[in-house]
Amino acid sequence: MSILSLVTAPDPILKKVSSPVDTVNDSIRQLIDDMLETMYHNHGVGLAAPQVAVSKRIIVLDLSKVDIEEDNITNSEYKYPLFMVNPIVKAISNQTVTAKEGCLSLPKQAIEVSRYHEIQVTYLDYYNKLKTLNAAGWLARAIQHEVDHLDGILLVDYLSNLKKEATLNTLSKIKDAAYDK
């Protein structure tokens, strides 16, 4: 496995809608393994392929080490880490919850976002099998966050234009300072 380079805002690849994967083959599995290694290396709980400069509909998640009140996987046969290819999310309740989220592509930022509390996600797994998972709480939030990346949506897109511009300017300064070292 390899640790891949993370892409940070305002990189244009993060604003693209990702392409579906035709089949989960060995090269896709290698990408999934590398994404998982990259996510762990950067202390993340989720990662989408566009965050490593790959415009494919793939996400990886692992909330097992996060201290959260509720992390509901309501299908007991599912264990972490989760690998989702071509995920399709639908709400199974109209209840939304607002909470702060962070993102590996938006370092040092925490942004409040309202998301569905309960969802159902259909996807291809690591072995190209079609799966359906019902999720609630933080897992549902994390899945929705990562799927946003596949649709070219970033946390800053939930902010007003003024706050969005200020946040992106801050990120540019952080990035510039890192390159100057």
Swiss-Prot record:
Keywords annotated in UniProt: Hydrolase, Iron, Metal-binding, Protein biosynthesis
Enzymatic reactions: N-terminal N-formyl-L-methionyl-[peptide] + H2O = N-terminal L-methionyl-[peptide] + formate
Gene3D superfamilies according to UniProt: Peptide deformylase
Recorded GO MF terms: metal ion binding; peptide deformylase activity
Cofactor info, note text: Binds 1 Fe(2+) ion.
Superkingdom of origin organism: Bacteria
One Pfam family, short name: Pep_deformylase
Active site, UniProt feature: 146
Catalytic EC class: hydrolase
Entry's EC annotation: 3.5.1.88
GO BP annotations listed: translation
Binding annotation for Fe cation: 103, 145, 149
Cofactor: Fe(2+)
Annotated family: Belongs to the polypeptide deformylase family.
Function text: Removes the formyl group from the N-terminal Met of newly synthesized proteins. Requires at least a dipeptide for an efficient rate of reaction. N-terminal L-methionine is a prerequisite for activity but the enzyme has broad specificity at other positions.
Protein name: Peptide deformylase
Lineage start: Bacteria, Pseudomonadati, Pseudomonadota, Alphaproteobacteria, Rickettsiales
